[in-house]
Regions:
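A generic structural motif
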Residues: 69-82, 96-97, 146-154, 176-188
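Short acidic, S/G/P-rich loop/turn micro-motifs used as interaction or catalytic elements
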Residues: 52-56, 74-79, 99-106, 123-130, ...
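Non-catalytic, charged low-complexity extensions flanking SF2 helicase motor domains
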Residues: 162, 167-223
Length: 223
């Protein structure tokens, strides 16, 4: 593919607004429901998380509700995904650490005749570029791809701007735990919070959880 082709071919993955839940429990239920829905449509599902603790909680929730899944513990390449998606009759849920995705592959034109897949991310990172890397990975697959991020108001990133006031307002407006919040305004707030956190970043030391990452790398904003 030439440079000009990058601006004239179909490259983008489907990226709906983030789904934001009132509580971690509601988020997990929403994740499980969406995974089930995709499996019912015979789709291959890739579940990602930036932190091991988050991915373990999702795996536990899927297992408890009878949704089979498996961990992929090594680096996941574009070729790996193609082989897994194209396995006849093998519709599965693969759990992967987001950091194991390659970031050095070029985007490919989407071939609509190929089997598609869904990518669900169980959190957003404090550093926007790490989320963008997942989107970039989806663009390298060359097949139909839907990418959805799930968050809760209790996520450390969300606490940087939401606080208890937003939770209380939503409850007064009749917002139930079974319904997710969507909207461009919240998306802008998330992006702004990520930019603010990145400006105070001292390091990028690995961590098992979002809370630990914040304490290690941006202690001034630890919640």
């Amino acid at each position: 593919m030439g440079l000009l082709d990058l601006f004239t071919t179909k490259l983008d993955v489907l990226l709906p607004d983030d789904l934001i839940w009132l509580t971690p429990e509601a988020k997990l239920k929403g994740i499980i429901a969406q995974v089930r829905g995709w499996l019912d449509k015979k789709r291959f599902v890739l579940v990602l998380a930036h932190f091991p603790t988050t991915l373990a909680k999702v795996e536990e929730g899927l297992s408890a509700t009878g949704v089979p899944s498996e961990f992929h513990r090594r680096r996941l390449s574009r070729k790996d995904v193609a082989g897994l998606v194209d396995q006849a009759g093998q519709r599965k849920v693969l759990l992967v650490q987001a950091g194991s995705l390659p970031c050095d592959e070029f985007p490919m034109e989407i071939n609509d005749t190929l089997e598609g897949l869904a990518i669900l991310v169980a959190e957003r990172h404090f550093v926007r570029e790490k989320d963008d890397a997942i989107f970039s990975f989806g663009r390298t697959l060359g097949r139909p791809c839907e990418l959805v991020f799930h968050l809760s108001l209790h996520d450390p990133l969300m606490k940087q701007f939401s606080g208890d006031w937003l939770n209380n307002v939503l409850h007064r407006l009749g917002m139930g735990e079974s319904k997710a919040i969507e909207g461009k305004m919240v998306a802008r707030q998330i992006k702004s919070a990520q930019a603010n956190l990145s400006s105070g970043l001292l390091s990028d030391r690995p961590a098992n959880s979002a809370e630990e990452w914040l304490r290690l790398n941006v202690p001034s904003m630890s919640v």
